């Protein structure tokens, strides 16, 4: 009986190997590129400059400049909103946008990675309510900084109020209120870093 049962068990297959997350990120697709789980609150992914309707998801394949990695994105809606709590790893002061090449990008369901032109390797994954970011700075980087931008949004999203404060050595807590397609959106966040925060500029 045991042998018969084993013979009738279906073999598990990894169907995610057939998924191409880049489909729909060009043209008028408005597809979000990044890391999320089904029905999750978090969609961690790259965010580009606002350049019109085709950038509604925060990302368009024709573009090669990033302004951050936001925690919330819409996908396939044609609605320009979200992009909240953008983080950007930089290697020099006043760096607020970074170029990248699609050859340096990799995406699979639940995971996104890119090596930026400044040499920083960015990796993203997510749970239903948490985004995980890993930044690997180049060995010769003179500075290792992370810009946390609360003003950045997607499409017609506009910040109406925000707050941010450091708690302990590694944690930043804050709020971001905005208006856009969602007329009164309120986001509350906690950002915990693996290294102590040694300096901050508000």
Question: Where are the model-predicted features located?
Answer:
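Boundary at the C-terminal end of the N-terminal hydrophobic targeting segment
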Residues: 4-8
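Accessory carbohydrate-recognition regions in carbohydrate-active enzymes
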Residues: 9-202
């Amino acid at each position: 009986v045991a042998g018969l049962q084993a013979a009738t068990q279906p073999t598990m297959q990894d169907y995610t190997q057939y998924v191409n997350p880049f489909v729909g990120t060009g043209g008028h697709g408005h597809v979000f590129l990044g890391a999320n789980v089904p029905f999750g609150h978090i969609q961690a992914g790259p965010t580009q400059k606002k350049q019109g309707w085709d950038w509604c998801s925060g990302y368009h394949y024709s573009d090669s400049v990033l302004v951050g990695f936001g925690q919330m994105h819409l996908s396939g809606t044609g609605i320009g909103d979200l992009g909240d709590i953008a983080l950007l790893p930089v290697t020099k002061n006043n760096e607020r946008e970074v170029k990248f090449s699609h050859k340096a990008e990799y995406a699979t369901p639940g995971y996104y990675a890119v090596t930026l032109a400044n040499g920083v390797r960015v990796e993203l994954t997510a749970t239903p309510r948490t985004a995980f970011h890993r930044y690997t700075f180049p060995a010769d980087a003179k500075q290792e900084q992370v810009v946390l931008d609360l003003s950045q949004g997607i499409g017609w999203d506009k910040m109406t109020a925000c707050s941010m404060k450091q708690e302990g050595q590694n944690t930043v807590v804050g709020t971001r209120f905005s208006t856009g397609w969602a007329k009164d959106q309120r986001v509350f966040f906690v950002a915990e870093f693996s290294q102590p925060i040694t300096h901050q500029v508000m």
